[in-house]
């Protein structure tokens, strides 16, 4: 990628990056072996019973708690749904993502995130990206929007805060859509197609970036 996209867009940049040695994991085999014909999640967001979503909402921080500058710590995938096989597959994807981020020069402490009222900035070295956001504390829900390559994109997700760290959880399907919008040359990229296939019938899958308060 030529510049940093909104927050965690880099988490699924494996779709836009060359295959690395660790990327030899065959996602298609996992799809056939683990999921068979159907793998739809049955999770209902903010359902009556206690769910990961209600727990996030109950612990949602005041937005002012997030103001300031944060340092990138780590990245991973996570599932908040009820599909027991999701974690198995996502655990295999994590090392691939970390390897891609490493090849991009993204490592602990290498990127910064600044959050202000309704807006923010993320940067690494000389590359930076402004974004805007809305935050619904009753659900711990956040929607990020930005303009990259003259194209507007938005991605929704959730915030999890445990001082001094904040986890930004963004919907993987929306991230893939954002990549396709910003970088149409990756529409048919093999890695992107595989990841998209992986999550197509799985709801509640998120790219998680952890940042530490400076």
Residue ranges and their predicted role:
Residues 92-97, 115:
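Short Pro/Gly-enriched beta-strand edge/turn motifs at strand-loop
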Residues 4-5, 116:
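Residue-level detector of intrinsically disordered/flexible regions characterized by low predicted structural confidence
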Residues 7-9, 152-153:
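Short alpha-helical segments and helix-capping/turn motifs at coil-helix boundaries
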Residues 12, 59, 102, 122-124, ...:
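Residues embedded in well-ordered secondary-structure elements
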Residues 52-57, 97-108:
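N-terminal post-signal-peptidase region of extra-cytosolic proteins
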Residues 75-80, 101-184, 212-213:
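Contiguous, well-ordered beta-strand patches that form the walls/edges
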Residues 2-4, 20-93, 189-214:
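Amphipathic/hydrophobic helical signal segments and adjacent flexible N-terminal regions
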Residues 8-16:
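Bacterial N-terminal signal peptides
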